[in-house]
């Protein structure tokens, strides 16, 4: 798992392209080997190299995104999209509830909850992700000089969150 991410980041750096990542899974399997734990550090270092090269790193959370994935590289994105209702967590709800000794809201650890607390920039249906990502990258990379407010409004009903996320 970690090797694939590191390879993808290196490919983005070598080709000077953005890195768009779709994390999905229960996390790095720490109990299987120390390699998984080491990969948390290695993937984080790879993302730092991407940032040193001033390349955008977009994360699109899918269901579920949990464990070591959220404890390392998934939360380091420049922009975070999430699918509606997806689980975004480090530890399970019961573990946290037992630790804090209080009842947690029913939407705890959902993309909506995480967005409300500032860790997700925008919730987007999967079918709309291509358009949203393309638009955002054209803004971030300033490559498409034809992008103007009229075109943006035709592409997206509500561009304010994208413009805010891009600034």
Regions found by a protein language model. Give the residues of each.
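Short, conserved loop/turn and helix-capping segments at secondary-structure boundaries
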Residues: 2-3, 37
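Intrinsically disordered, low-complexity segments enriched in small/flexible residues
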Residues: 136-167
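A structural preference for short, pocket-lining loop segments at secondary-structure junctions
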Residues: 3-29
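Conserved catalytic cores of soluble enzyme domains
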Residues: 27-141
């Amino acid at each position: 798992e970690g090797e694939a991410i590191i390879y993808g980041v290196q490919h983005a750096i070598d080709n000077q392209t953005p890195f768009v990542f779709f994390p999905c899974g229960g996390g790095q399997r720490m109990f299987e080997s120390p390699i998984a734990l080491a990969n948390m550090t290695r993937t984080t270092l790879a993302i730092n190299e991407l940032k040193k090269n001033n390349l955008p790193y977009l994360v699109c959370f899918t269901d579920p995104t949990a464990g070591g994935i959220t404890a390392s590289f998934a939360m380091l994105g420049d922009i975070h999209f999430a699918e509606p209702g997806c689980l975004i967590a480090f530890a399970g709800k019961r573990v946290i509830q037992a630790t804090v000794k209080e009842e947690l809201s029913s939407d705890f650890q959902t993309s909506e909850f995480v967005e409300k607390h500032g860790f997700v920039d925008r919730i987007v249906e999967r079918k709309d992700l291509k358009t949203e990502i393309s638009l955002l990258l054209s803004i971030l990379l300033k490559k498409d000089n034809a992008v103007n407010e009229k075109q943006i409004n035709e592409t997206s009903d509500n561009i304010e969150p994208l413009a805010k996320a891009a600034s």
